[in-house]
Amino acid sequence: GRAAKQKIPVSFDEKLTNEAPQAWAGQIEQLVFKGSAYIEEVVFFHKDSQTLILTDLIENFETESFPNPLRSKVYKLVRVAAPDGQTPIDYRMTFIGHQKEAKECLERMLAWQPEKIILAHGSCFLENGRAELRRALRWIR
């Protein structure tokens, strides 16, 4: 992967699956989001705070603060600009032909009833998490 190419040492204790490891089982649910031909993102849900934690599945950048107006326009074009942040177009394209798997994963995440969504890229959604999840992943049919 990227870490190896950049000679960054990375070690793993175990592979993440749909079952939470003993260390956080009962507190945090997790799901391997399937459907992409190239990427499997593990999503997490912290039960007590009703918080969904995502890495790349949704990006939501505040483009008004970007110093370069062209960059701001590009982010809007690829649908990762707030307040309508979604799955980046390049990532979304990897789901072509596998929407059924993605839909099943989305349904499981919606069943968790998240109130908040923490994102690795951009502004988080601190309320109405379930509605924001539906909105951002509306491309999954």
Language model features with spans:
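Short internal beta-strands
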Residues: 1-4
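Catalytic core of the metallo-beta-lactamase
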Residues: 8-77, 104-105
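Short active-site-adjacent helix-start/loop capping segments
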Residues: 6-9, 126-127
